[in-house]
């Protein structure tokens, strides 16, 4: 962990090492050639400037691929500030390149929880020409932390007592302390932020789940676009991205031979599907756990054994959580696992695994092997390896998804930001999805790069199907 991040005199950035700029810029240049969707959007909208002067905060993994997203948003007019959405996911050379280009960025690999939430606050803090502190007009969120902080801050200013209630986790304690501090240092700040805030686009399953929960209670403060459930996000980033990046994270962390190992994948949604197929492709024997009978049946029809975590204890070599739920792997599971077991998460938050309970287990011995790899010697003498402290293994122990698949996701994010701003007076405070036509367009932008040639419908064929020759080609309810 970098305990002394570098800060510019005018708080323009807070990163690990500005000298990494050249390395970061070289990798950004490579990524641009692998991200045809984003680059096409950049060319299309650069002259139109649809986000001209719009204050945009990003809370999303500060990677090389995200750097291309940031520079696309800037090229179409946005005034951008950025933080990572995970304490381990920042690529420090990417952050350096973005800081050098003039974008305020607050992110480094190995932040503490206090540093992480302070970085989120700094990314949310814009200063008007008269010196007034305000917030963003749009947010690009990943996991919903920026959205959560604004909602909790606003609710505190309007009488909520949540900050004084018992906390479920250490991270919740950190959030509450931050909100109490801001209430003293910046009275009325969150109300000013909400007055200017026009919308949020959310990247992940976990963040979308949060949005729907808030909307169901009538407390959602702005319109939100669910980017995660765009087909060109969920069926590509979640599935094909995880199919490549999970194994990358495991191998960089442990140098482990996957062939012949028994691996348990908890969850068989899109992320679980990609993870299970990745491990099987490497020769691992894969067991899936599921709560949903449809997903369980899918896994079984793909040839995976489907059972419970409890039935695998003492046998499996690797456990991977992919669910977006909490307490999927509990302390009683970990103490019953076989010696030398590897436990990791590729869902979103670290609460999929009871990490706090593992750290607090009486008689446990914790040994750090290297960054994001911890060895726990349990009271029974068995050893358990926990990767990335239970946070995202593909970003904590490797570099996340490849550029090409992230171009799909980030093209959706950019289009969502444009849509939110153009329709800020139309959208109500609800959760929306991008229309099918835009989803298809995102896919179309990536075809030439991989040598795909589409068949074109004749007018008669289109009429027979009851669709336009140009699409959309599927109804909204179609399941890809």
From Swiss-Prot:
It holds the Pfam family AdoHcyase_NAD. Substrate binds at residues 63, 142, 203, 233, 237. GO terms for molecular function: adenosylhomocysteinase activity. One of its GO terms (cellular component) is cytosol. It is found in: Cytoplasm. Binds 1 NAD(+) per subunit. NAD(+) binds at residues 204-206, 238, 267-272, 290, 325, 346-348, 394. It is an enzyme of class 3 (hydrolase). CDD domains: SAHH (cd00401). Coiled coil: none annotated. It catalyses: S-adenosyl-L-homocysteine + H2O = L-homocysteine + adenosine. One of its GO terms (biological process) is L-homocysteine biosynthetic process. Belongs to the adenosylhomocysteinase family. May play a key role in the regulation of the intracellular concentration of adenosylhomocysteine. This is Adenosylhomocysteinase. The gene is ahcY.
